[in-house]
Amino acid sequence: MIKVTSAEQFNTLLETHQKVVVDFMAVWCGPCKLIKPEFERLSTEPEYRAIRFAVIDVDQVPDVSEKAGIRAMPTFQTFENGEKKGELLGADPNKLRKLMDELARV
């Protein structure tokens, strides 16, 4: 799990990893706290080992969050070869797993 702290780090992450999932969250966000353990658990599952997991605090890296079009937290975005492939707004564990399955299959 990578904690992204700058736009440069985010861009490098997308350039150097084929598949990436990003959790755009905020420390004050209740639903973000509820889904965090599930996101962390998914990052350790064998079927997702080819995917790089990252977290961005929208208050600490607002430029990346704004560029990504984040309107609510949590928002999960998936990327393949630097291009956005999917998005999930909200803290639904079943939908998060479905999003991960879609990225893992690509």
Stretches with model-predicted labels:
Residues P62-R71:
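Mid-chain, well-packed structural core segment of small domains
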Residues M1-V20, K98-V106:
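N-terminal leader/targeting and pre-domain segments
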Residues Q18, M25-W28, A72:
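Short pre-active-site segment immediately N-terminal to redox-active cysteine/selenocysteine motifs
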Residues D57-D59:
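Conserved acidic residues
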Residues C29-C32, F76:
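The canonical Cys-X-X-Cys-His
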Residues K33-E47:
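Typically the conserved alpha-helix immediately C-terminal to a functionally engaged Cys/Sec
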Residues A72, Q77-V106:
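Non-catalytic, surface beta->alpha helical segment in thiol-disulfide oxidoreductase systems
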